[in-house]
Amino acid sequence: MSEKPPSDVPLPYADRPVATAPGHWVLARAGKRVLRPGGAALTAAMLDHARLPGSDVVELAPGLGRTAAEIVAARPASYTAIDRDPQAAARVAAVVGDRGVVRQGEAADTGLDDACADVVVGEAMLTMQGDKSKAAIVAEAARVLRPGGRYAIHELGVAPDDIDEEYYTQLRRDLARAIHVNARPMTAAAWRGLLEDAGLVVDWVDTAPMALLKMSRNLRDEGPGGAARIMWNVMRDKALRARVMEMRRTFTRYEKDMVGIALVAHKPEAGAGTAPEEAGAEGSSPGA
């Protein structure tokens, strides 16, 4: 195991003022540990469909390492994480210890061998990319997967598929202003299309409410102690409180339009046909 516990490793952007730091790292400063748009339940469902035990797993941009801990607990054959941020990489290395390998690198150019992984996992990172970068990262995931391997993603979605384009543009602008990241969430149809354009076959799709700052979600994901920690940190720090409230107002304004969405797709064998996808029960994750 690492000599340093995760709490002793600085958060990414820790030297940047709260007023200008990316929203997800602001929430991490507040003490939030589950930063995925659909919550821990949607992540758990995604990992279950990815079939981790005995697999060689690669995780792209693992962030705080919360999902990394769940992956290594599932007893994969191997675990490799790729993160461009040295502080994030250090935190994940502290989480997985000798149960995995963490490398600093780019999600679109991992440096890994062709067909070296059974599963590639990525959460809440494609949303932050433009169209070309999204496609490049998905292509890289497809490259490192073995035939039959699974690509599992958990991202921010918008609904419905035929959302008004002008309204969608305003949603994106307001979201970018609130979180200080040029986030580009997509419809379920667009997320499916992104994976299919890389030659992958979508097997499973599920959604959950985007309730990142709702008390019920925090109690479920963080536990009573974690939720209390977040509330205390926010209440005692004026700048932190202002940023969190700004994000909360935007999330509330668009709560009917945004969802957490998870998909699992596989890389087909050469010459294999496609199979119909499996949708989650009534399109939502249990307990989300």
Positions of the model-derived regions?
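Class I SAM-dependent methyltransferase Rossmann-like catalytic core
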Residues: R16, A21-A40
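Conserved alpha-helix/loop element of class I SAM-dependent methyltransferases that forms part
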Residues: R36-P53
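Conserved class I S-adenosyl-L-methionine
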Residues: G54-G63
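Class I SAM-dependent methyltransferase SAM/SAH-binding core
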Residues: L64-D109
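A short acidic, Gly/Pro-enriched loop at the edge of an enzyme's catalytic core
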Residues: A108-V120
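A short glycine-rich, Lys/Arg-flanked "PGG" loop and its adjoining helix->strand segment in the class I
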Residues: A135-R150
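Conserved catalytic/acceptor-binding region of the Class I
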Residues: G148-M210
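Conserved Class I S-adenosyl-L-methionine
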Residues: W204-A288
